[in-house]
């Protein structure tokens, strides 16, 4: 909405509502100091290996049976952790965890820049093959989003 304020002859007004008024981002935005905000955000992203300093793989798992989905997600996350260690986060349920009768959980994988993406894909395929070999999980669908937003 701020982009629409002040488009005419008179200046517009932007109201920022927050539960954290002392957060530095609020100050930077209020002052229009976007360069400081970007510098801080990029430093945080570098420290925690988030894009643009890494690539993200988001695995979205869906199933009508919540108990089975949880078991399958834990199995796959463990198989991935055996190959990627701390680069694996989850499984976690998204805020809307059921759509069209299917429950949803997600697993995130971070691969730092400079690491071999070909090797990462190979290791991920191995973990998915382990998961696929378990017949009990055949009703669980998995979608992979690389560079998830």
Label each residue range with its predicted role.
Residues 3-149:
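Accessory helical-bundle/CTD segments and flexible terminal tails appended to RecA-like ATPase motors
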């Amino acid at each position: 909405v701020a982009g629409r304020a002040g488009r005419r002859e008179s200046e517009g007004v932007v109201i920022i509502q927050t539960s954290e008024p002392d957060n530095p981002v609020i100050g930077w935005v209020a002052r229009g100091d976007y360069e400081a905000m970007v510098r801080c955000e990029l430093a945080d992203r570098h420290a925690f290996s988030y894009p643009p300093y890494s690539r993200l793989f988001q695995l979205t798992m869906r199933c009508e049976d919540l108990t089975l989905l949880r078991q399958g997600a834990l199995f796959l996350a463990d198989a991935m952790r055996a190959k990627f260690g701390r680069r694996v986060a989850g499984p976690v349920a998204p805020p809307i965890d059921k759509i069209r009768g299917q429950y949803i959980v997600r697993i995130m994988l971070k691969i730092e820049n400079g690491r071999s993406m070909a090797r990462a894909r190979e290791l991920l395929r191995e973990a998915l093959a382990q998961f696929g070999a378990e017949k009990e999980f055949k009703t669980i669908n998995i979608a992979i989003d690389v560079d998830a937003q």
